[in-house]
Amino acid sequence: MSTAPRYTINRSIVILRYKQAFLDWLMSADPNPPQDMTLDDLGDDGDAFMIPGENVVDNMQDAVKWVEKHWGMFFEHTLEGWLVDESLWPQKRTLKMFREWFTIEYRSMVWDLVNAPILTEDWEESEDGAEDTLH
């Protein structure tokens, strides 16, 4: 019996890695900034996002285009993960700022190593009750 990964998921993965500009902003905006925070500390447990796979996102260039098309959602999700008080967020967020604050990593293959159904959890509903997701 083989123990090698057997099933792939029809998604790709992107990870946003923080750049120094994000750390500088966080340390200045947070009323109680973590002492001695480094970029390595920030990257210890970041989110991984499943995005469309084959036929939509086939390579790094496609992944960057896809993320940049949805940059506002990624930006707000990340900011909220650090500071829930939106008044502390940069008010004039732009794609240029997004590019200065984050590096995009891309993985084309997502392997499912668990022999059980994938369960999803809706973390937020829109005001009208409809799903507030990109899919």
For each predicted feature, which ranges?
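Extended, charge-biased low-complexity segments
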Residues: M1-V57, D62
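Short acidic DE-rich linear segments
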Residues: E124-H135
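Generic N-terminal initiation segments characterized by hydrophobic and/or small/turn-forming residues
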Residues: L23, W71-G72, E131
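Amphipathic protein-protein interaction modules
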Residues: G53-S126
